[in-house]
Amino acid sequence: MGKVSKSPGKGEKRIGKVGKKNGKSNAPTEGSNSGKASRFTMSERNLGLMQEIIRKDPESYKEEFLEQFNYFVQTMKLLHLQPEQSRQEMQSLVDSVLFLSGLAKHYPKESKQFSDSLFELLREQGAGLDPEVRMAFCKALVLLRNQDMIDPIILMETFFELVKVEDKVLRKFLLSSISAHLKRVYHKKKDVKMLGKIQNLCFSKMKDSRSIVARAAQLVCIDAFRRKFWRDARTANVIAQACFHKVAKIQVTSMKFFLGSENENGDAEDSDEMDSDAEDNTKTLKEVMTSFRNVKKTRKREKNVERAKKMISKKKKAKKEGRSKECNLMAIQSLYDPQEFVDRLFGAVEAKKMDNFEVRLFKIALCARIIGIHRLHTLSFYSYLHRFLQPKQRDVTKILLYAAQACHEMVPPDTVEQLIRVIANNFVTDRNSPEAMTVGINAIREILSNCPFAATEELLRDLSEYKTYKNKNVSMAARSLITLFRAVNPKLLARKDRGKPQEKDDEDEEYNGFARPKVHDFISGAEILDEDAADGEQGHLEEDGTDSELDVSDVDTDDVDTDDDADEPVAKKKRVEQKSVENDAESDADDEEIEDEEEMDDEEEEIEISDEEEEEIDDEAEEEAVVEEEASEAVEKDPKLKASKNSMDRIMTQEDFKNIKAYQLKKQLIGEKRLKKQMGKGRSQADERIVDEMAEKLELKRSSDGLARLSDIEHFYKKKRQSKEERMADVMAGRADEDYKFGRPKKNGAHVGRTNDQNSKKKVFAMVKNKIRGRNRQRSFRDQQKSLRHYLMRQSGRKPQ
């Protein structure tokens, strides 16, 4: 059993066949000048040419295909006996496999046997094959799948079995091929049934006892969720169950998926559009290499190409990392039972099992994130954090961040107060460094911004005294805490720190306590709506009344003397007429004529109203008008009454809500100005900076998931002075990524401020040839003569004068 030999007589037979089909002899003649073989010589190096010929006429060249197929079958039998042969020994088989896989759709019967042979060999001898041979077989199967010649589910099952082979390149190829097939099914075919089958297969593989197979299925599910192939609650919960896997690496992968933030500002919308814009404005690696291939190779150009390649790879990596941090908020919100999940995960944290500190920190972070988003009650979590709240603790700023994220308005104030006391006693003391004090006050501020009910007057006033501390960072952190409670509950502050009230009623305002939500009985901002529009709508509705009202008003109108100037009597007459009609309906049929006459007499008596009654009605109308006028004046003076009246008396339209939103934004800007005026006439730029930053943070929390960021905890207003070594290290690190050379920026984008001359050099010549020809025609005879003289002098090697 030595090396695999080529099929006997293969080349000669092919030559004869092809020559016969073309009606020519392909044997090289003695008078051949070039001495090259014919273009139809079917040796191992031109199987690609044979493949193109067979694609044009599969039936005529079926014999050549069968010849290669028989050679493949015989070689596979040998490979079953000796699977460990190298790539050099099996090169002919690899070429034959790629040849047959490209023509499989033209010969379905043979392709079925071909794919079965590949599946059988990979399942039985996959681990013992040469890596390159194994990779070639997998690529052939992927090609067959793309041609719909094999079942994708069977192929994926085979790929998951091959994941256990210790071949890093193969694993990467298998996972990428599965993701590519998902993308193809989702975007091109829109086959929901096939997506469901693949999803069920991946979910079953995540429960596999082999950790490497479970991890591969986990990576496929995470990638499909991020790329919106399987963005549903079922996928998110299956990934969440991997947080309790026995292998720590699988746990960390799932927890990283849930913990990755969308971005620092919480905005993940239009990320695909931003990525596409970035791709349009930057050159691809293929464009860079193509332009470099067609120019003279110099040292400068080689450096530029290397720099461009580094920049492109860096942007690809940044894009991949940005995609990996998406969708965590949606995944957390999709959990079926977040309370049970947090209790189980926190139980694993509290267990005596010795986990790595990084793994334990990931579990604490995930618990805090889910507690904060879902407003859960896991009170033992806060007391568990007490042991880690020490300035010398490893990653203490992250633990402070998790404590702030886990606090929300539904946590009992006494629990949060204990947490704040621990932070204040361990961090905000004179025996600690200014950095530790700053971090502690920042953490307390973030906790109290989520749980303002936990603040006590004593603690808050003690922390406010640090506004005059000698260190700038500590004093600014204390001022930011004061600024927060000026907007939340200024009564807890000392009188000198409260500032001026923003509104007239702020001094008498009652601030809600714990579990007492503030209920609005009107739409805030509805006072700006115009009442005339509402009156017009009501009048229009009154005109379009019901049929019954119209019928009643039309009864016996001939017998009633109408008066246009007296609206009230007319209304009373109509009510009287309605009563008479009802009485007519109740009369007996026998005495109908007599009772009709009597009722007509009674009706005439009731209609005749005396002058005294008319005067009384007029006085009542005037009194009602005066009362309504006074009430309208009171409503105009009090915006709350006007807003309440507009909210109750009209039906809001989309235009009304748009006007209210614009008014609220304007009012918010005015409120910020009033907040700055609270500082007094002698306010500093630092105070204004605190106010602006606090407003940005509050707006950020309202617009995103509402959780604190690590930059809020580690925020220092005045950075520590760096040493010379640190500054030089920053300089050297920046030079590797610099986009500037000799003071000029690198022009990589499509629109980066090039001049018209530079842009004209890149235009296609067909676009500018007419312009150049016209420019030459417009030149004077003197200019043409001068140009010709300079040209002739340059041609002769002389310098033009």
UniProtKB/Swiss-Prot annotation:
Protein name as catalogued: Protein SDA1 homolog
SUPFAM superfamilies, alphabetized: ARM repeat
Pfam family, one: SDA1_C
Composition skew (Acidic residues), residue ranges: 544-568, 583-633
Keyword Transport part of the UniProt annotation: yes
Encoding gene (name): pro-3
Primary subcellular site in the record, as a coarse category: nucleus
UniProt note: phenotype after gene disruption: Worms exhibit defects in hermaphrodite gonadogenesis and germline proliferation which are associated with a reduction in sheath cell number.
Positions of the UniProt region annotated as Disordered: 1-40, 495-517, 536-647, 739-801
Effect of mutating G48E: In ar226; confers a recessive temperature-sensitive Pro phenotype in which an ectopic mass of proliferating germ cells occupies the proximal adult germ line
Biased segments, Polar residues type: 24-40
Keywords: Developmental protein, Differentiation, Gonadal differentiation, Nucleus, Protein transport, Ribosome biogenesis, Transport
Gene Ontology CC entries for this record: nucleolus
Coiled-coil segments on the chain, per record: none
Family as reported in the entry's similarity comment: Belongs to the SDA1 family.
Cell compartments where the protein resides: Nucleus
Record function comment: Required for 60S pre-ribosomal subunits export to the cytoplasm. Required for normal somatic gonad development and for regulation of germline development and proliferation.
Domain of life: Eukaryota
